[in-house]
Curated annotation (Swiss-Prot):
UniProt cross-references to InterPro entries, sorted A to Z: Phosphoglycerate_kinase, Phosphoglycerate_kinase_CS, Phosphoglycerate_kinase_N, Phosphoglycerate_kinase_sf
Protein known as: Phosphoglycerate kinase
UniProt keyword terms in alphabetical order: ATP-binding, Cytoplasm, Glycolysis, Kinase, Nucleotide-binding, Transferase
Family according to the record: Belongs to the phosphoglycerate kinase family.
Organism annotation: Caldanaerobacter subterraneus subsp. tengcongensis (strain DSM 15242 / JCM 11007 / NBRC 100824 / MB4) (Thermoanaerobacter tengcongensis)
Any one biological process term the GO annotation gives: glycolytic process
GO MF annotations in UniProt: ADP binding; ATP binding; phosphoglycerate kinase activity
Lineage top rank: taxon: Bacteria
Classification via Pfam families: PGK
PANTHER family: PHOSPHOGLYCERATE KINASE (PTHR11406), PHOSPHOGLYCERATE KINASE 1, CHLOROPLASTIC-RELATED (PTHR11406:SF23)
Pathway: Carbohydrate degradation; glycolysis; pyruvate from D-glyceraldehyde 3-phosphate: step 2/5
EC number from the UniProt entry: 2.7.2.3
Length: 394
């Protein structure tokens, strides 16, 4: 990796501000329901503790709309982090206020301070230079380890790096090396599976991946725009009318490049998107006009699984059907299973694909689950991520 990491600098005795991604889901009693993002940050935090740094952590949680809201406090996170680190975590009452400043100044080597939710300040998402400067003034060194927000140019992800030496943490290093290797130098066959609702969300990814992959497997709501572009009727399925021409161009380009561009051959259909409604499977050329396509069918699952099993590199981003509804989650679950049985390098983008892998207990059977949905998408598009771009080069 071309960027400096925490290994490349001396952190002993220094106050180190680490941007982590502790945006974890909680239930109504403020119990954390999935602590994966906290656990993913531990290697960097533990390295800093063991190397006698004074650790100051900054994160967002949810969307509190730029003002203080106790519902979005990071206090439950401090408690969980303390359990995982087996040591106290000091909680600041604010981000750049008096309490944060006093506690940051008083930190001893090996101690950990968690600042309150950085999005309690509207200046965070505006990347306000004054706010970034105040935040930077708490520390001597800045570490970005929040891949999940690396595609956002916010004060705590990009702004502070203007005022302090700035390096990557181990999680960002891991994300970049595994995904970077897959894109730059993949073992072949290289297969990408793209799902989700809209073609428009994935145009950049498809365009970039067509230059690199051997097979591209399409599922989810976006498949129906391609199916329509091939001249089939799609009933009441999701359609982006204004993207039909583009879908034709993409398929033509895949053909020219010799990419195996696969669309569903059968589909699960239902009259409405809710649990408990009758549903059936039809071939793709037999869609009734009053039904909605909600998932890939069994023949498609079989075809896609075969391609995945023989792949040496697989990247998956986006569900194959309406994953929130159990009856229409079969396709997504089957793809997750095929990935878990693939012997090659398997990379899962964040969001629903990651949730499917986690729920089914396949997390340790894939090479890498990205911690950032949006960030991993933009990385797959070949875009520059501002939170990484701004870090110091080696």
């Amino acid at each position: 990796m071309k960027k400096k990491t925490v290994r490349d600098i001396d952190v002993s005795g220094k106050r180190v501000l680490v941007r982590v991604d502790f945006n974890v889901p909680m239930d109504e009693n403020k119990n954390i329901t999935d602590d994966r993002r906290i656990r993913e940050a531990l290697p960097t935090i533990e390295y800093l503790i063991n190397h006698n740094a004074k650790v100051i952590l900054v994160s967002h949680l949810g969307r509190p709309k730029g003002k203080f809201n106790p519902d979005y406090s990071l206090k439950p996170v401090a408690k969980r982090l303390s359990e995982l680190l087996k040591k106290p975590v000091i909680m600041a009452e604010d981000v750049i206020g008096e309490d944060a400043k006093v506690k940051a100044a008083a930190l001893k080597e090996g101690e950990v301070l968690l600042l309150e939710n950085v999005r309690f300040h509207a200046e965070e998402e505006k990347n306000d230079p004054e706010f970034a400067k105040e935040l930077a003034s708490l520390a001597d060194i800045y570490v970005n380890d929040a891949f999940g927000t690396a595609h956002r140019a916010h004060a705590s992800t990009a702004g502070v790096a203007k005022y302090l030496p700035a390096v990557a943490g181990f999680l960002i290093e891991k994300e970049l090396s595994i995904m970077g290797e897959a894109l730059e130098n993949p073992k072949r066959p290289f297969v990408a599976i793209l799902g989700g609702a809209k073609v428009s969300d994935k145009i950049g990814v498809i365009t970039n991946l067509l230059e690199k992959v051997d097979s591209l497997l399409i599922g989810g709501g976006m498949a129906y725009t391609f199916i329509k572009a091939k001249g089939y009727e799609i009933g009441k399925s999701l359609l982006e009318e204004d993207k039909i021409e583009l879908a034709k161009e993409i398929m033509e380009k895949a053909k020219q490049k010799g990419v195996n561009f696969m669309l569903p051959v059968d589909t699960v259909i239902a009259k409405e998107l809710k649990s408990g409604v009758p549903y059936e499977v039809v071939d793709i050329d037999k869609m009734p006009e009053d039904q909605i396509g909600v998932d890939i069918g069994p023949k498609t699952i079989e075809e896609y699984s075969k391609v995945i099993k023989h792949a040496m590199t697989v990247v998956w981003n986006g569900p194959m059907g309406v994953f929130e509804i159990p009856e229409f989650a079969k396709g997504t679950k089957a793809i997750a299973k095929a990935l878990s049985e693939c012997k090659g390098t398997t990379i899962v983008g964040g969001g629903d694909s990651a949730a499917a892998i986690e729920q089914l207990g396949y997390a340790d059977k894939v090479t890498h689950i990205s911690t950032g949905g949006g960030a991993s998408l933009e990385f797959l598009e070949g875009k520059v991520l501002p939170g990484i771009d701004i870090l110091n080069d080696k």
